Amino acid sequence: MEHGYLFNSNSFSHDLPFLWEAGGRVLVELPRQPFGDGRTYQHRANDAGNPHDTLLIWKAMFDEFHEESRVSPTYCPFQFHPYISGRPGRAKTLRSIIQHMKKADGVWFATGSEVARWCLDEVFKAEHAKAAPRKVAAS
């Protein structure tokens, strides 16, 4: 918090972003989820894995989140690593899931910073205003 970070992604404890407050400063927690290439390829950077099965898993995860979003907001943080999905045999799978996601209505592709800023400005606006640090004039 003291070094200007906007968000953290260490928690597995929630499904949706939430606020951490300490010492009058606020940090958005963007909870991690087991979605992405590390889980489906089991962090095997050089093993072949099975890109076809991985794509089916990713589509099923995304489709469920998208269906749930019709009832209430969802947060689906897929994590892709260049050393895992950037391999020639896996890049096509990555392109395929992105194309699948782009076909769905109401999907926002955003960085962690963009999501955290949106949470502060829109979702947690009232909470953030209460916890915002006060500016003090220097003498």
Residue ranges and their predicted role:
Residues 1-72, 126-128, 139:
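Active-site-adjacent pocket scaffolds in enzyme catalytic domains
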Residues 55-139:
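C-terminal domain-boundary segment and adjacent tail
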